Amino acid sequence: MEKRSTPSLQITDRFGAQAAFASLRLPDGTEATVPAEHAAAIYVNEQPAFRVVCTPALLPQLALGRLLTEGWIASADEVEQIAVCAEGAKVQVYLRHPLPTRRAAAQEVASCCTDNIALGSPVELQPLRPVPGLALQPEWVERLTAAMHAGLPLYRATRAVHSCFVLHKGEIVFACEDLGRHNALDKAVGCAALAGLPLAECVLYTSGRGPMDMVRKAIRAG
């Protein structure tokens, strides 16, 4: 897996990964396995940016991916540190540069399918840019389709989450799950960015629909 050199990005995750699902007894006496839900607030340079409802895992990757795909940053190189508190309720992201005042202004904007809220003003975001052409090979699609059909662990247990795969040079290098397709994509992008992968050479394969906001996320990722 080819990587590019990046400035050191420090991650302090005191929360880690918690139980991904739980078994509940229904009124009729049967049991159902449901995914765990977790709420967290993402701050950028001490300013509130997003509130997310997600599965309780990969919070640093979710935060980094969200900033990339929403246009707050153009590269993971801009991030100096990501810190998650022990309860996982707050994710602090510190950039290597000040955050423009208007971008830090609090403004609640509904975002995607799990009650996520964007708290930052949607101005001064990174503009959309042309995406380099990537020749998609038929065998890549077959490999991704087979992996999606097989299902990831949380999906197999609950049948109630979305998945997103990252493919690089024909190999699946990351596979992420979450309650919402946007979160799953953000986690996948965050994983790839932390690994130093050239995102312009990667393929994202998602279980969710591909509406304009998801396409925009993929473009901003690279």
Predicted regions and their residues:
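Intrinsically disordered, low-complexity regions enriched in acidic/Ser/Thr/Pro/Gln residues
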Residues: 2-163, 167-168, 174
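Generic structural signal for well-ordered alpha-helical scaffold segments
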Residues: 149, 189-193, 215
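General structural feature for long, well-ordered alpha-helical segments within catalytic domains
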Residues: 58, 137-140, 144, 181-184, ...
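Cysteine/selenocysteine-centered motifs that mediate thiol-based redox chemistry or coordinate metal-sulfur cofactors
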Residues: 82-99, 199-222
